[in-house]
Amino acid sequence: MSQILIIYTTLRGNTGKMVEPVAEGIRSEGVEARVLPVAQVTMADMRAADGIVIGSPTRFGAVDWQIKRLFDEIAIEGYPGPLEGKVGGAFTAGSRAGSGAELTLLNALHILLNHGLIIQGEPFGPHYGPVALREPTDEVLHFCRTWGARWARLVKRLVLQGEAPAVEGGTH
């Protein structure tokens, strides 16, 4: 079974409320969703995953420092990196409109792209991934589920059908 690792941190609990609906969507497609707070993530966890989702609060238009640090430390591994060819995505919760939530998602996706992950855009909703302003609404939580399911379908297409690039030391 393919596995997606959801790495998250939450400041006021709002990003944390989005984690389970994303995981539910992933599981609804028959893909394992492994959820870990950023402080518990190891390199082995990341290598074992076929996809990686970042869940971060909006911090002045950027991901939380713990997320940034984790991916900075992975960069030390050199090229090609251990995450190349995996599928990546992100979601965030901000404090209010104009707080930088869209920039936070772009920052997260930029980090994932720099590590060689494959990113899928969203043509009909928030283009870069789920966004909540303060506490996630029912509409946002529903989008988290549908986004997680859509994202899991991409992982299945690329990984389970052997279309994703082979990664030395990875699972595919």
Question: What is the role of each PLM region?
Answer:
Residues S2-R27:
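N-terminal beta1-alpha1 ligand-phosphate binding loop
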Residues I4, A33, I119:
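Hydrophobic anchor at the start of a short beta-strand
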Residues I7-T9, L36, F91:
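Short hydrophobic segments within beta-strands
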Residues R27, V31, A75-Y79, L113-I118, ...:
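Generic secondary-structure signature for well-ordered alpha-helical cores
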Residues A39-F124:
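Helix-loop-strand module that forms the ligand-binding subsite of alpha/beta enzymes
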